[in-house]
Amino acid sequence: MRTFPGGVYALTRETPDTERLLAEVEAALAGGVAAVQYRDKSGDVAQRHAQASELAALCRRFGVPLIVNDDLRLADLAGADGVHLGRDDASIREARIILGPAKFVGASCYQSLDLARAAQTAGADYVAFGSFYPSPTKPAAARADVALLARASRHIALPVVAIGGITAANAAPLIDAGADSLAVLSALFDAPDVRRAAAELNRLFAAEPEE
């Protein structure tokens, strides 16, 4: 089983403009993002399948995994590298049965170390916590404490992803606390230069941790 890569985890915006979507993701990949998550809950079935399939092919060119948010069937049909599941989605065990041992299964654990322990027991490949900062895409999301990342690093033997309002200006404390990956949407795809924004975030993982 592969280990989910650490670094910048790009979360795509929802858009019917597939050409724009692919151009933005390609720029993020060129900037060094480690993984991409396709998120779209409003498009029709045909659009979502087409976008996910094209993104999977694009990510393969860069050797970067494409994860599909919430939709196990789409992840399977589009040839994605895995699925990310929330508490109301399919079970981790079901995802593992359908996708097999070589694909990634990630789990949203919100602010709960207990959910992370359960996800690990069920066979997840990574766990995600948040929201750590106010999020433009999910303004009502409950906030997580940065100390949760340190506890997770001590007690969970899986890569830890931080999510929620993350920018290059506020990301360092999350990495210092134990985040292996930063899931980012607005700070990447609302930036005037997506490639440069990805590279700036990526450089944070090479910086020396603060004492």
Swiss-Prot record:
<dbReference type="Pfam" id="PF02581">
    <property type="entry name" value="TMP-TENI"/>
</dbReference>
<feature type="binding site">
    <location>
        <position position="70"/>
    </location>
    <ligand>
        <name>Mg(2+)</name>
    </ligand>
</feature>
<dbReference type="GO" id="GO:0000287">
    <property type="term" value="F:magnesium ion binding"/>
</dbReference>
<comment type="pathway">
    <text>Cofactor biosynthesis; thiamine diphosphate biosynthesis; thiamine phosphate from 4-amino-2-methyl-5-diphosphomethylpyrimidine and 4-methyl-5-(2-phosphoethyl)-thiazole: step 1/1.</text>
</comment>
<feature type="binding site">
    <location>
        <position position="108"/>
    </location>
    <ligand>
        <name>4-amino-2-methyl-5-(diphosphooxymethyl)pyrimidine</name>
    </ligand>
</feature>
<dbReference type="InterPro" id="IPR034291">
    <property type="entry name" value="TMP_synthase"/>
</dbReference>
<comment type="similarity">
    <text>Belongs to the thiamine-phosphate synthase family.</text>
</comment>
<feature type="binding site">
    <location>
        <begin position="185"/>
        <end position="186"/>
    </location>
    <ligand>
        <name>2-[(2R,5Z)-2-carboxy-4-methylthiazol-5(2H)-ylidene]ethyl phosphate</name>
    </ligand>
</feature>
<feature type="binding site">
    <location>
        <begin position="37"/>
        <end position="41"/>
    </location>
    <ligand>
        <name>4-amino-2-methyl-5-(diphosphooxymethyl)pyrimidine</name>
    </ligand>
</feature>
<keyword id="KW-0808">Transferase</keyword>
<dbReference type="GO" id="GO:0005737">
    <property type="term" value="C:cytoplasm"/>
</dbReference>
<dbReference type="GO" id="GO:0004789">
    <property type="term" value="F:thiamine-phosphate diphosphorylase activity"/>
</dbReference>
<keyword id="KW-0460">Magnesium</keyword>
<dbReference type="InterPro" id="IPR022998">
    <property type="entry name" value="ThiamineP_synth_TenI"/>
</dbReference>
<dbReference type="InterPro" id="IPR036206">
    <property type="entry name" value="ThiamineP_synth_sf"/>
</dbReference>
<dbReference type="InterPro" id="IPR013785">
    <property type="entry name" value="Aldolase_TIM"/>
</dbReference>
<keyword id="KW-0479">Metal-binding</keyword>
<dbReference type="GO" id="GO:0009229">
    <property type="term" value="P:thiamine diphosphate biosynthetic process"/>
</dbReference>
<comment type="function">
    <text>Condenses 4-methyl-5-(beta-hydroxyethyl)thiazole monophosphate (THZ-P) and 2-methyl-4-amino-5-hydroxymethyl pyrimidine pyrophosphate (HMP-PP) to form thiamine monophosphate (TMP).</text>
</comment>
<dbReference type="GO" id="GO:0009228">
    <property type="term" value="P:thiamine biosynthetic process"/>
</dbReference>
<feature type="binding site">
    <location>
        <position position="165"/>
    </location>
    <ligand>
        <name>2-[(2R,5Z)-2-carboxy-4-methylthiazol-5(2H)-ylidene]ethyl phosphate</name>
    </ligand>
</feature>
<keyword id="KW-0784">Thiamine biosynthesis</keyword>
<protein>
    <recommendedName>
        <fullName>Thiamine-phosphate synthase</fullName>
        <ecNumber>2.5.1.3</ecNumber>
    </recommendedName>
</protein>
<feature type="binding site">
    <location>
        <position position="69"/>
    </location>
    <ligand>
        <name>4-amino-2-methyl-5-(diphosphooxymethyl)pyrimidine</name>
    </ligand>
</feature>
<feature type="binding site">
    <location>
        <begin position="135"/>
        <end position="137"/>
    </location>
    <ligand>
        <name>2-[(2R,5Z)-2-carboxy-4-methylthiazol-5(2H)-ylidene]ethyl phosphate</name>
    </ligand>
</feature>
<feature type="binding site">
    <location>
        <position position="89"/>
    </location>
    <ligand>
        <name>Mg(2+)</name>
    </ligand>
</feature>
<feature type="binding site">
    <location>
        <position position="138"/>
    </location>
    <ligand>
        <name>4-amino-2-methyl-5-(diphosphooxymethyl)pyrimidine</name>
    </ligand>
</feature>
